[in-house]
Structures are given as structure tokens and as C-alpha cells.
Amino acid sequence: SFITGTLGQYFTFRSFCPEMAIGLGTPRETLRLVQKQDGIHCIGNKTPSLDVTDRMIRNAEEQHSWQQELCGYILKKDSPSCGMERVRVYKGDMPERNGTGLYARVLMENFPNLPVEEEGRLGDPVLRENFIKRVFVFRHWKDLVAEGLTTHKLMDFHAQYKFVLMSHDQNRARALGRRLAEASGEPVEETAEWYFAELMAILKIRATRKNHVNVLQHLQGFLKNEIDSEDKQELAETIDKYRIQLLPLIVPITLLRHHFRRHPHEFIDRTKYLDPHPAELMLLNTL
């Protein structure tokens, strides 16, 4: 209901079934992944002679044209075609959970920066927020590229996501910022390629409470000459209560929004950290 109901207000969904696409009707025999000498095959669970490996891979490659329009992909947990990770792979009678669905593998190889998640994992508040945030960032980037990318626009984009990146991995975020600054004389297309790949790789890392506290305190510093001692104490206590898990992330963020509305700051007004996705999704309420 969250996917189709809540997210449906912001996303347009397209369903796709690889099994149906290769001609397997419904009802149909279940499939499984089997390790053979020449690699992993997708075969019938009861009929080993039903081997759809080549058809599945070929069909997955044929979906490239519409997949390149996507901003995210929700896959099916444990599916031999659509499982993102830990899919059962049989070698004899003993399965190991170390596989990836054939369709999912081709998708992720062709679009390594595309936000991908399994529907079952979206029940985890941290993974859900992470995936949806990446989808919005991916769409923002696509719009930026469509408008025509310039060095100035790329620098501005990075400035907007600086604190978001720091909440995921401070060291890699700083390294990315330094590398981007050093690349100011390079062709923007070349810079954009490695920059976006690293941006999405950093965002894929789970943001931590420790990193969030660091970012919140950094933002607090912008207000040191703007708010009185009572407000400073309240803000510091709120951040600390988040640190020790007495409050969700939305509380210190809401308080920071309040202060920056009263005391606007040009740089903070542009940052996506305080508004990474629509408030109606309530994704920060459970972090």
C-alpha cells in the first residue's frame, strides 16, 4: 500500500514481468537458479529440461530503451529473475543464498547508477528513505542534464547535496568535493560521468546517526550569530536527544527549518538536506 498508495502520488509506475515477456503464461512452473559448469542457469523447478537462461538474458537486454527513462526500480525479493541479492542458487540439492536474478543482473549491469531496491526491504524505514531519496536525486540529475550541463550548474548541484552526502559518508563526500574542485578545467561531460557515479555510490551507503549529528551540528554553526542563548540551548539539546535516540530525525530538522526561515542563509536555502523529499512521505519521522 505504501508503494502504490503513498508513492503513487509522486511516481508513475510501470510493471514488467520477465517470465511473461519470454512467453511463460500463468499459471506457470516455478523457476530456480542452478549452478552448472558453464555458469548459472534459470530452469524449471520440476522440469530441468526447461532452461530459459538465454531467453531471459536476451529479453532483459531488449528492455534497454524504456529502462533508460526510469528513475528507480523496485525488484522482487528471492525471484530467480528479479531478485536483487541473496537469491537461492542450487548446486545439487543444497542452495546457497548468493545469487542475483538474471533480469535484475542485466538491469543493474546496464544501469549501475540507477536506484534499485527490493519491495520486501522497503519495509525497513532506513532502506525506504535511502531508496526514495536516491530516486529524487536521480530525477534531479536527469533534469539537470536535459537542460544542458555546465561546470557552474554541476558545482551548484554539488553544493545542494553536500550535507546529504556527508550524512552518508563524510570522508568520501569530502574527497568528492575536492576532486570536483580540482576538475574545474576538465570537459564537463567527462567530469559529470565520474561525479554522478560516485555521488550515487555514496548515497547507496546507509546514512548513520553519527553522521546526521555531525551535519546537524554543522548547520547549527550557521546560526551562532543569529539566535539567542536560549534558542541555542534548545537546538543543542534537541540534536543531542536525537543522538541518544530519544527523538526522530524530523524533530531537529524541523527546528532548524524554523530558525532558517527566521534567519535566511543563502547557502542553507539551497541545501537539500533539510528537504530531501516531500514532507507528506514522512520518511524522516521514523529515522
Regions found by a protein language model. Give the residues of each.
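Short catalytic helix/loop segments, enriched in acidic residues and glycine
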Residues: 1-14
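Conserved beta-strand segments of alpha/beta enzyme cores
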Residues: 12-15, 115-117
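Internal, conserved structured core segments that host functional sites
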Residues: 65-146
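Glycine-rich anion/phosphate-binding loops
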Residues: 48-68
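Short, amphipathic alpha-helical segments
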Residues: 50-57, 94-101, 105, 170
